[in-house]
């Protein structure tokens, strides 16, 4: 599998780019979010990649961040969403915006992405709930990135117990920083039961 490419950007034709890595040109499709953040042709670039092998083609998709690639991987697991549709979704909204829309069950926002109707948007909410993490501060529902590994572990445990991402993050806000995971989960569960 090709996980990452570092080389010289030699072509930019939306949504495709070509990166020269030691004399070998790798063609990759990228989201428009990634495309707009690329350096000029001739400059050095690094992309996280996902290789998809089909009967008739080997397709390489590139992403500016590992988080965007992780979101892409979750999207292509959703029934009815292929690689090109997933790339279209990530072109229409950032990974954080997608995570927020899923957490808020915003079917209207999700169905505004190309190739996504109401039923597919509802399926996305159902299948992606709790699997995407927003790292952007928006309306106070999402914390920046977790301040400590313990916080992330506590949220992960609550998600595994069936709580929504919104509930888990809200419950963890009441847990003092530096609390170990076991105690943190206990306190977070107490917050949820209030």
UniProtKB/Swiss-Prot annotation:
<dbReference type="InterPro" id="IPR003583">
    <property type="entry name" value="Hlx-hairpin-Hlx_DNA-bd_motif"/>
</dbReference>
<feature type="region of interest" description="Domain I">
    <location>
        <begin position="1"/>
        <end position="64"/>
    </location>
</feature>
<dbReference type="GO" id="GO:0000400">
    <property type="term" value="F:four-way junction DNA binding"/>
</dbReference>
<dbReference type="GO" id="GO:0005524">
    <property type="term" value="F:ATP binding"/>
</dbReference>
<comment type="subunit">
    <text>Homotetramer. Forms an RuvA(8)-RuvB(12)-Holliday junction (HJ) complex. HJ DNA is sandwiched between 2 RuvA tetramers; dsDNA enters through RuvA and exits via RuvB. An RuvB hexamer assembles on each DNA strand where it exits the tetramer. Each RuvB hexamer is contacted by two RuvA subunits (via domain III) on 2 adjacent RuvB subunits; this complex drives branch migration. In the full resolvosome a probable DNA-RuvA(4)-RuvB(12)-RuvC(2) complex forms which resolves the HJ.</text>
</comment>
<keyword id="KW-0238">DNA-binding</keyword>
<dbReference type="GO" id="GO:0006310">
    <property type="term" value="P:DNA recombination"/>
</dbReference>
<dbReference type="GO" id="GO:0009379">
    <property type="term" value="C:Holliday junction helicase complex"/>
</dbReference>
<dbReference type="InterPro" id="IPR010994">
    <property type="entry name" value="RuvA_2-like"/>
</dbReference>
<feature type="region of interest" description="Domain III">
    <location>
        <begin position="147"/>
        <end position="194"/>
    </location>
</feature>
<keyword id="KW-0233">DNA recombination</keyword>
<dbReference type="GO" id="GO:0006281">
    <property type="term" value="P:DNA repair"/>
</dbReference>
<keyword id="KW-0227">DNA damage</keyword>
<dbReference type="Pfam" id="PF01330">
    <property type="entry name" value="RuvA_N"/>
</dbReference>
<dbReference type="Pfam" id="PF14520">
    <property type="entry name" value="HHH_5"/>
</dbReference>
<dbReference type="InterPro" id="IPR013849">
    <property type="entry name" value="DNA_helicase_Holl-junc_RuvA_I"/>
</dbReference>
<dbReference type="GO" id="GO:0048476">
    <property type="term" value="C:Holliday junction resolvase complex"/>
</dbReference>
<comment type="function">
    <text>The RuvA-RuvB-RuvC complex processes Holliday junction (HJ) DNA during genetic recombination and DNA repair, while the RuvA-RuvB complex plays an important role in the rescue of blocked DNA replication forks via replication fork reversal (RFR). RuvA specifically binds to HJ cruciform DNA, conferring on it an open structure. The RuvB hexamer acts as an ATP-dependent pump, pulling dsDNA into and through the RuvAB complex. HJ branch migration allows RuvC to scan DNA until it finds its consensus sequence, where it cleaves and resolves the cruciform DNA.</text>
</comment>
<dbReference type="GO" id="GO:0005737">
    <property type="term" value="C:cytoplasm"/>
</dbReference>
<dbReference type="InterPro" id="IPR012340">
    <property type="entry name" value="NA-bd_OB-fold"/>
</dbReference>
<dbReference type="Pfam" id="PF07499">
    <property type="entry name" value="RuvA_C"/>
</dbReference>
<dbReference type="InterPro" id="IPR036267">
    <property type="entry name" value="RuvA_C_sf"/>
</dbReference>
<keyword id="KW-0963">Cytoplasm</keyword>
<dbReference type="GO" id="GO:0009378">
    <property type="term" value="F:four-way junction helicase activity"/>
</dbReference>
<keyword id="KW-0234">DNA repair</keyword>
<dbReference type="InterPro" id="IPR000085">
    <property type="entry name" value="RuvA"/>
</dbReference>
<feature type="region of interest" description="Domain II">
    <location>
        <begin position="65"/>
        <end position="143"/>
    </location>
</feature>
<protein>
    <recommendedName>
        <fullName>Holliday junction branch migration complex subunit RuvA</fullName>
    </recommendedName>
</protein>
<comment type="similarity">
    <text>Belongs to the RuvA family.</text>
</comment>
<feature type="region of interest" description="Flexible linker">
    <location>
        <begin position="144"/>
        <end position="147"/>
    </location>
</feature>
<dbReference type="InterPro" id="IPR011114">
    <property type="entry name" value="RuvA_C"/>
</dbReference>
